[in-house]
Amino acid sequence: MTITKTRAYIAGICSIIVTVGVARFSYSLLIPIMQKGAGLTELESGWLATSNFMGYMCGVFIAANMHNLNHKYNLHRLYLILSVVTSAAMVITSNIYLWALLRFIAGTCAAGGFIIASGLILKWLVNNNHRAELGIHFAGAGISIVVTSLLVQSMLATNSNWQQQWMALAILAAIIAIPAWLWMPHPTAHGQIKVTKKDNPPSKTFKLLMMLAYFCTGYGYAVSSTFIVDIVERVEGLKVQGSIAFLLVGLAATPAALIWDRVARRTGFIKALIAAYTLLAIGIILPAISDTLLVIIISTLLFGGTFIACVSLVLTMAGNFYPSNPARFMGTMTLAYSAAQIIAPIPSGYLLEYFGNYNMALYLSAFIVMLCTWFLFGLLKCSK
């Protein structure tokens, strides 16, 4: 089958919807529903999120250390299958340990959309003389949030329980996985030409600062993405509106990577990232300052408009250092991101139980994200 630029991007977007939207983001949407219908506690919800992030880190570790591109291609296909299976399997048990195992496997699958698929598409773009940007691909993150939010919201209108929600998400993933399976470009086929760009690895100091900045990003992302629905649900007058807030995040995230690609063309990657991180920190801290509807809307739009931009810009920059095998350094970078995601939900869960709200968790998260800018200014000095 001939792979065109359009088909490659569609495959990438569909891959993200399946492996990230359903296997990862949907859990955030279903936390309040599972707390009410399945007896999931606040602390357990944090531990399940951590299990999901641990799985993601495992998937990233595999991607970073797997050098055979053909194996990566086949692994991506396996992740598509497992994303469907783990979602459907959530309905057959209410055992917290089995849920943790399923969330771990689903997290591993999420690495397929963010790392392996990104690397395969970036390599195909470079090898076929297209612009080496992943903004369109990462628009899939926003689209995945929109699609899953609309599905959950529509099923809430019909009083569907948490089991029906998970099964509907599994069916959705199975359908959308088809173009991701058929059109993802194979690394040694589909008309790819010989790589003309040589690897241009950065210095060790540059790598270290980049990883520290991305670690801080992962912490901020983990707290908001996991608990944003529950944060909104706790606001008086916004009950049962959490999935709508998540929908706003998705709507903001869909064009964000494309917009920030254009910003980066004018300012460079690092200056664009400094701006994105600053706005991300503001978006994270706003709900702790005020819980009015307007502030919540601004917060969700800022978070949606920046979190995926940070991922897209960092991974594109990392991939461009190693055009022969982009996913390798992408994976190394994302290990730092994933480590923070594993850590973040646990203190957030304890802070929630101690204070009775998310305010302290959000203050801590915003502070850690602002540390990113300090590391990025260090990167500016390294790049001069």
Regions found by a protein language model. Give the residues of each.
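C-terminal transmembrane helical hairpin of 12-TM major facilitator-type secondary transporters
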Residues: 270-314
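Helix-loop-helix hairpin linking two adjacent transmembrane segments in secondary transporters
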Residues: 129-185
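Paired small-residue
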Residues: 97-106, 294-302
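Helix-breaking motifs and short loop linkers at transmembrane-helix boundaries and internal kinks
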Residues: 39, 92-98, 268, 289-291, ...
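Helix-to-loop junctions at the C-terminal end of transmembrane segments
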Residues: 59-71, 256-268, 352-353
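Cytoplasmic helix-loop-helix junction between adjacent transmembrane helices
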Residues: 102-140
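Extracytoplasmic gate region of multi-pass secondary transporters
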Residues: 28, 206-247, 251-255
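A late C-terminal transmembrane helix in Major Facilitator Superfamily
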Residues: 321-357, 365
